[in-house]
């Protein structure tokens, strides 16, 4: 009742919903007054739609009713069939119970049938049994003639006869070993023929890469024979599940043996490529690896293009050969890695393993694509072995670089003693071959390392810079020893100045080469940071160059010593040409120094200028002369001014092109001359004060020596000047370069000077 009530409510709701929808639809149609004229047209159209929907609904209901009627009919038929089957099963069960005793009484008949089957098999194979010796001979002849397919056909006949007889015997009396042995013995030659045929097959497979090019039919025959044997193996193993019998020599597993033979052949081919040893050829490993590369590439191309046509697809012959070659190469590379390799041999091996193997020259060759995916290949050497080789290489390379640098320096040292001048570069600067030799060696090792990996390249660069740092320290020591040796006998070496210039220039070449090396081989900021953390070599190179320049200037001033000693003496005052000789000597030396590269020549010129002025002022402070009159003071002061101008002109000439101020130092001589030239002693304090204000490093002993040189200052005046200057010490300007600081006044105390 509840169900009918719910259905009624649902129908009522549906009617109400339909009415509401209709009202809404009519309202939508009649929104304007002019649409009232079309009411009849709208009504007829809706009536047609209603009739169409009702017709489709009736057809659908009728179809559903027909389906239900058909289903009921089929269910009725199925029920009748089930009843019939049930009755038939009952009849079969009844008949089976009644026939049990009858079946047991037929056991003798069953045994007779089995015996008959065995005898029938014997009769069927009788012809083959009698012809076994003849078939054996024919098979042997065919094998020797190379007719492998025909030989295998006859071998199959022999094995089939033997296996059939033995199987029947096994079924009839599995425990009768004597009869089984008799049959096996009669067919004893069969196993020997099988082994002989197998040898021929393996020989063909061992030369398969040659055979496939010359006689692919022979290789196809071998594969067909192996495939036949595989089918026989599968059939016998299936029969074993039913009978438990397996013929002797089965399963042969010739397919498995075929892949084993191919694997051994590949291994032998890889191992047999080593034609030389280290003793007979230093490049033995490079030659060995190149032969391997060529052989493997050629073999795989042949396998891809030709061998795959001779084997069934499911053998995946190319994939298997690729795996065999890869494994054989991995084993060979491990064997080579375990040997005591030299540094260049380690590089050759790692370059081949890490780069050549996967490159377009080998596994990445377009002729092997797409079957060979280099990204899927396992590494030939494990990361641990590669790491050990790299460690060994770095250790050996370190020792080699140290030895190479030592030898290069020894060779360069021998050149320093030559009687001939060193070579000059394209700009005319003296140089030796040392920087070129050193950086050529670095370049070679870096290029080699870059072939292996970027990481190794960076490590080698760091190593080179480290060893360069140590090398430059030794270079500095050797240059110092060279200088000391020359000072012991200035006549030797003959070209001391020229080779010392070359040593100085080498420092600039080393600097430029280091910058070039870093720029070329450092690609990332991380690498640059790594190398910048290494000790800077600029300081050592500048120290070597500075020492070299100092030694050359020392050479100059040793020659000038005699003429410097003439300054501020009676001879000088009477007209000595010491300054003329000094200028000529300095200019002559600087003609040789023109072979020094610009940065160092600039510093050397400035230092020579400063030192000449210092030596001149030192002569002033040496108390070699004391002027006795105003005329002598005037004459001496004017001579000092003229000589200052001479020196100024000289060093302007030497410093041309450097942008150096060649006047500052010579102005000091002029300032001192002004103090000497002063005619009014009462103004002496003012003049000295001016001098002290310009040169704050001037000391009391310098003033005392200067006043003593004038020869006209009273003791009280000297004392007053000295005390006044002591009360107000002058402050030096930030840019002032001390010049009097180096000048030592002879050990006469101030009191004596004042007297």
Curated annotation (Swiss-Prot):
Gene Ontology biological process terms in this record: membrane fission; mitotic cytokinesis; protein transport; vesicle docking involved in exocytosis; vesicle tethering involved in exocytosis
InterPro entries named among the record's database cross-references: EXOC3/Sec6 (IPR010326), EXOC3/Sec6_C (IPR042532)
Pfam families hit by this protein: Sec6
Main location: cytoplasm
The keyword Acetylation belongs to this UniProt entry's keyword annotation: yes
GO CC, any one term: growth cone
Oligomer status and interactors: The exocyst complex is composed of EXOC1, EXOC2, EXOC3, EXOC4, EXOC5, EXOC6, EXOC7 and EXOC8. Interacts with EXOC3L1. Interacts with BIRC6/bruce. Interacts with MYRIP. Interacts with SLC6A9.
Family recorded in the similarity comment: Belongs to the SEC6 family.
Protein name: Exocyst complex component 3
Organism expressing this protein natively: Mus musculus
